[in-house]
């Protein structure tokens, strides 16, 4: 695959607008109006480096021992075959040669971790980030790959001479590392397989319903902790295996600390200014040898997310979040013997998985109109240059306009979000607004969970608010534990009111500017964003249509569907799982007790794994003769992972908002039944009594 040759470190800025043509060659400006639009089909096929849920510290990339090459995994969805294609890619860090696909294949490997006392949680739907491991000589990669449901270790030649499995066991391999060019250490949990087999045997007599069950994700007991990790060493030449020594285990378990670095005899780390306050600012601390720690008092030393030491130059480099509501990322350079950092780069986009290579960082980078790609960032000048773009063709499409919004909400909290407008938007035109939640850092794809296609919605004529949830009021207060803070946030749904008020403040701001029609506002959400949808429809009159990816926020879902283990844990965090829907806690969020006073058309696009939790609220709305539709996608999880389903969700979301906010329909014959149902819902709505106004 060829790497991108487009020299476009970032989009062109005109005031606060990011132009749709920021990454087009100059010769393309004349033809921009003829460029094709970004459709759901285009969006769903964009290739991804790593996983959709990557953070600044997610290890997306792997540098070769000599620093000349970088390896990473690329995933691309195909909605026609309903498959995700995985490629292991090697790219020269100097950009001189094209990237090489050293392996193509494998199945979608779900990200699962121990949580809530379960040995392995139910898949969220996000894929596991696969970080390949370089052999000491730099000739091969070792990495995890799943085929036919089994996770094995594969080895690939970095010259593209072939790849094959080298470690297979009766259990899934969970981690791997080289000890030398011919020896690998790997880990897994054979006890998990044994525990699953015991559950299968128990099923012959019938399972006792107990704390092992999580009904929302299945009717089968889950394996509980603890399950021991086993470490094995494989000799690739002889094929012999043995138990790993403690020293070898330490080699595998050792992971770099993103918030710790050495420069000479000075150790740099990050600590809170008040160790007893979980919300106290974090700041840089330097300790020379065995001396006393010295705290950096500069504002630039706070909110650090990554750091690297350069002993040759006697310099520390670090990334931090800064600016209004921490909406920017910045890179700083600081002499090791003087706590005076100097900023050398900043932007509103994202840098993820950065690795230092001599005087450069190699990072995965994305911005509002730029999907994730690889870039180099010069540690002296701050100049960013593209290294590898898995989606070079996106630049030929006609992209919407993006404006970064900043305001202080009615609670005094700094907020940022992004306004996305159609490519041909004319100033002064009022558009229907669709709100997509609840993170707006990086590429504006589909919001959290990637279900609400921002660019195609804008292309369809909507203004789109890519909403970034504000910090909670409680996060500015002193708490000694997350549980204590959570209880404060759930008290009277304090944080949910803060989110809803922020949404209303942004709607009012866009209304004052004449950008939107406040009578035609749609709201979407997944996970925590879905809770905001439920809360917003009950407690506000601002929303004319809504789409949610899960449902509902009520006593049944929190207590019954979460099972005894999780429901008990949720209660400790301030969620009243033992209170009925008509009690004071759930009255603000439950459709069951509020159905008669709602009137907003609601589309629920649920995974089959979660739809049972939607039935009480959905049924209450149906019985109250309210406009609601429930779509269930088979073999899906909290985040939908199948390309065909993602495309269907994209298209149905656009159709729903076009129908309710624009009074438009798609004439495609295969959608006739859909619109028959929706016209029946509209007729039902017109016959229903007026809803009770929100408080």
Swiss-Prot record:
Keyword Lyase among record annotations: no
Positions of the record's site feature: Important for activity. Binds to Astexin-3: 116, 562
GO biological process terms held by the UniProt record: proteolysis
Disulfide bond positions: 296-301, 354-363, 551-552
Main location: cytoplasm
Originating gene: atxE2
Effect of residue 111 to A: No change in activity
Keywords tagged on the record: Cytoplasm, Disulfide bond, Hydrolase, Signal
Secretion signal, residue range per the UniProt entry: 1-30
Coiled-coil annotated spans: none
SUPFAM superfamilies in the record: alpha/beta-Hydrolases (SSF53474), DPP6 N-terminal domain-like (SSF82171)
Its job: Lasso peptide isopeptidase that specifically hydrolyzes Astexin-2 and Astexin-3, converting them to linear peptides. Has only a few specific contacts with substrates, because it recognizes Astexin knotted structure (principally the loop structure). Its binding to lasso peptides opens them to expose the isopeptide bonds for hydrolysis.
EC number: 3.4.-.-
MF (Gene Ontology): serine-type endopeptidase activity
GO-annotated cellular components: cytoplasm
Organism: Asticcacaulis excentricus (strain ATCC 15261 / DSM 4724 / KCTC 12464 / NCIMB 9791 / VKM B-1370 / CB 48)
Site (Catalytically important residue that stabilizes the alkoxide intermediate. Moves to point toward the isopeptide bond) location in chain: 438
NCBIfam families from the UniProt entry: lasso_peptidase
Claim: Metal-binding is one of the keywords in the record: no
Residue positions of the active site: 527, 610, 638
Subcellular location: Cytoplasm
Name recorded for this polypeptide: Lasso peptide isopeptidase AtxE2
């Amino acid at each position: 695959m060829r790497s991108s040759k487009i020299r476009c470190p970032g989009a062109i800025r005109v005031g606060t607008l990011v132009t749709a043509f920021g990454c087009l060659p100059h010769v393309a400006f004349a033809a921009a109006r003829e460029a094709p639009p970004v459709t759901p089909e285009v969006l769903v096929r964009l290739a991804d480096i790593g996983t959709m849920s990557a953070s600044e510290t997610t290890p997306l990339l792997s540098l070769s021992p000599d620093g000349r090459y970088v390896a990473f995994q690329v995933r691309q969805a195909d909605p026609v075959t309903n498959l995700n294609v995985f490629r292991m890619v090697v790219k020269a860090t100097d950009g001189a040669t094209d990237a090489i696909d050293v392996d193509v294949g494998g199945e979608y490997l779900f990200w699962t971790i121990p949580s809530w006392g379960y040995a392995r949680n139910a898949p969220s739907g996000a894929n596991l980030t696969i970080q390949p491991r370089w052999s000491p000589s730099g000739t091969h990669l070792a990495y995890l790959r799943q085929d036919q449901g089994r996770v094995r270790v594969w080895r690939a030649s970095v010259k593209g001479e072939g790849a094959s499995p080298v470690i297979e066991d009766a259990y899934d391999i969970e981690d791997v590392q080289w000890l030398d060019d011919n020896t690998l250490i790997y880990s897994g949990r054979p006890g998990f397989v044994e525990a699953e087999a015991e559950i299968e045997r128990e099923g012959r007599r019938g399972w006792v319903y107990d704390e092992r069950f999580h009904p929302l994700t299945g009717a089968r007991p889950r394996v509980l902790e603890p399950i021991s990790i086993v470490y094995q060493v494989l000799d690739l030449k002889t094929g012999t295996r043995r138990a790993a020594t403690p020293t070898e285990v330490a080699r595998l378990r050792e992971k770099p600390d993103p918030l710790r670095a050495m420069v000479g005899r000075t150790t740099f780390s990050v600590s809170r200014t008040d160790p007893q306050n979980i919300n106290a600012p974090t700041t840089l601390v330097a300790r020379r040898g065995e001396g006393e720690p010295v705290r950096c008092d500069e504002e630039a030393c706070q909110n650090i997310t990554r750091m690297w030491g350069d002993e040759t130059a006697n310099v520390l480099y670090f990334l931090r979040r800064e600016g209004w509501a921490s909406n920017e990322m910045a890179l700083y350079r600081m002499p090791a013997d003087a706590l005076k950092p100097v900023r050398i780069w900043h932007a509103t986009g994202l840098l993820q998985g950065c690795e230092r290579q001599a005087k450069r960082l190699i990072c995965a980078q994305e911005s509002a109109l730029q999907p994730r790609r690889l870039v180099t960032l010069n540690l002296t000048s701050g100049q960013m240059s593209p290294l590898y773009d898995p989606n070079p063709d996106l630049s030929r499409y006609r992209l919407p306009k993006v404006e970064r919004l900043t305001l202080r909400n009615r609670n005094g909290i700094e907020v940022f979000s992004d306004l996305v407008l159609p490519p041909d938007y004319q100033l002064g035109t009022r558009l229907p607004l669709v709100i997509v939640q609840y993170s707006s850092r990086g590429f504006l794809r589909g919001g959290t969970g990637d279900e609400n296609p921002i660019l195609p919605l804008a292309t369809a004529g909507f203004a789109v608010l890519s909403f970034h949830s504000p910090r909670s009021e409680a996060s500015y207060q002193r708490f000694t534990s997350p549980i204590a803070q959570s209880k404060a946030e759930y008290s009277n749904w304090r944080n949910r009111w803060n989110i809803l008020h922020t949404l209303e403040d942004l709607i009012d701001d866009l209304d004052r500017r004449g950008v939107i029609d406040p009578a035609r506002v749609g709201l979407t959400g997944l996970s925590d964003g879905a809770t905001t949808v439920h809360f917003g429809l009950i407690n506000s009159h601002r929303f004319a249509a809504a789409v949610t990816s899960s449902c509902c926020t009520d006593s049944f879902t929190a207590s019954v569907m979460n099972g005894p283990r999780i429901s008990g844990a949720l209660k400790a965090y301030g969620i009243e799982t033992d209170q009925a829907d008509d009690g004071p806690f759930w009255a603000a969020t439950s459709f069951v007790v509020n159905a008669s006073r709602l009137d907003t058309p609601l589309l629920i696009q649920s995974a089959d794994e979660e739809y049972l939790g939607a039935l009480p609220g959905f049924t209450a709305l149906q019985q109250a003769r309210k406009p609601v539709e429930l779509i269930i996608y088979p073999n899906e999880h909290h985040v939908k992972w199948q390309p065909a389903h993602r495309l269907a969700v994209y298209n149905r979301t656009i159709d729903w908002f076009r129908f309710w906010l624009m009074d438009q329909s798609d004439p495609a014959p295969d959608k006739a039944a859909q619109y028959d149902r929706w016209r029946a819902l509209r007729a039902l709505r017109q016959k229903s009594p007026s809803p009770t106004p929100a408080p």
